[in-house]
Amino acid sequence: MIEFDNLTYLHGKPQGTGLLKANPEDFVVVEDLGFEPDGEGEHILVRILKNGCNTRFVADALAKFLKIHAREVSFAGQKDKHAVTEQWLCARVPGKEMPDLSAFQLEGCQVLEYARHKRKLRLGALKGNAFTLVLREVSNRDDVEQRLNDICVKGVPNYFGAQRFGIGGSNLQGAQRWAQTNTPVRDRNKRSFWLSAARSALFNQIVAERLKKADVNQVVDGDALQLAGRGSWFVATTEELAELQRRVNDKELMITAALPGSGEWGTQREALAFEQAAVAAETELQALLVREKVEAARRAMLLYPQQLSWNWWDDVTVEIRFWLPAGSFATSVVRELINTTGDYAHIAE
């Protein structure tokens, strides 16, 4: 299995180094749910600004403040502890008057707004995230500048970031041990983290191998293509390749790679044979996913950061802003820019 740091680059290995997250203010994330609170209902959506505390810790503190069980507070995604982040929490408080959440106090956390909502906020139920990153001690400004311009045109590999695999790869290692021993895992969180790490690692492997072999944006017979921003896909046939290639070049269509699991992967013929060969050595992880009934799915191979802009504060410091759809990783953008001395594994999704 290819380690995250050794995955194939789209724009070649960066020529310079830099520091990511010298302090929390260098990594700012603003969650974009893609909808507004309903203004009524048994739930309360709470937008918080936090620095130095993780999402679960804040959710538990909010539950305690509201005198409800911790499971009654949900969120769309974990946000990094060592960053400045804005996100929404959702508390189920039926049949009660609206509590005064301005009285909620927690070090490093501030309530920005809150309102009633009809539905529970579920994990993954967000449109995306806006990022503002500051890279410091950049050793090669010209290389980073060129790469930023190239990313505007060609995007970056849509890899799952190192944080998906746990600190030191602990989640992937757990999945590998589980796959080898077939010992039942009772802890639901471990099961979820380990299965997610296994499937993500296989996806990364497929994308890395495709980048090695050919132009990642070259449509081949049997590729599974999806409309940009959509989840469904269709299979490319030889007769359609020229037209489909035009639509891919125009970023109307995205070529996908497999998220292996039970059931058909979605590709056929040449594309399917390539994907199967790319992960042929990982039979135990594949068998684990099938055994645990994790359904196969698809994910775009490339990621195009939206609203990408940057500003050089000086020759060694650059502020970069962009928006990514849910499930994408800012670290997969950063790794195409610099060899970073920051710690990827501590950056939450």
UniProtKB/Swiss-Prot annotation:
One of its GO terms (cellular component) is cytosol. InterPro entries: PsdUridine_synth_cat_dom_sf (IPR020103), PsdUridine_synth_TruD (IPR001656), PsdUridine_synth_TruD_CS (IPR020119), PsdUridine_synth_TruD_insert (IPR011760), TruD_catalytic (IPR042214), TruD_insert_sf (IPR043165), TruD_pseudoU_synthase (IPR050170). It catalyses: uridine(13) in tRNA = pseudouridine(13) in tRNA. It is an enzyme of class 5 (isomerase). Residues 155-303 form the TRUD domain. The active site is at residue 80. GO terms for molecular function: RNA binding; tRNA pseudouridine(13) synthase activity. Gene3D superfamilies: TruD, catalytic domain (3.30.2350.20), TruD, insertion domain (3.30.2340.10). The gene is truD. GO terms for biological process: tRNA pseudouridine synthesis. Its EC number is 5.4.99.27. Belongs to the pseudouridine synthase TruD family. This is tRNA pseudouridine synthase D. Keywords: Isomerase, tRNA processing. HAMAP family: TruD. It comes from the Bacteria. Substrate binds at residues 27, 129, 329. Pfam families: TruD. PROSITE patterns: TRUD, UPF0024. Responsible for synthesis of pseudouridine from uracil-13 in transfer RNAs.
